[in-house]
Amino acid sequence: MAKNIPLSTIGVKISYAVETVAGTRPTTGYNIIHGLYSTPDFNAAPNTADATSFDNKEYTTKIALLKEIPDNLEFGARMGQTFVNEWETLVSAYETGIKTSSGALETWFCIDIEGLDKSIYFTGKPIALGIPSMEANSGIDITAYISPTGEPIFSTDPTYANDGE
């Protein structure tokens, strides 16, 4: 019998790449975003609809419908100059890609979990950073937002433009 080996968040990489051909997800050249510490939950339960009929005697019957993705996906980050620079570069890359004269080039985001054979990919629009709340005697955290423009998928791990250093 196969033994399940639980995974951890050690080694998780969150990255992005802009399409070079409209409608084709890049497989190489992903840029790792440093300083992130949390991801949104993509494990959404589907909506349901009542399918109860007069045949039911005690319980209702439901059918599964579509899963709902939040309007904005929230990524927690430890605010630092490297993170801010990388996020600004991401926003600029998105804006350049989406305005390309040869057709809008989507930005793909990747969540790569160490020890898992496939990564999670989705397209989205990164939102420029705002001003985070702060408290005395603490580190500064910020929430970075991405508005999803496509459904998440699992596919093979990418190759990276930067090695994560």
Per-region residue spans from a language model:
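Extracellular jelly-roll beta-sandwich "head" domains, especially the C-terminal globular C1q domain
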Residues: A144-E151
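Solvent-exposed edge beta-strands and adjacent loop segments
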Residues: A2-M79, T123-T143
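Extracellular/virion structural assembly segments
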Residues: D55-K125, L129, N137, E151-E165
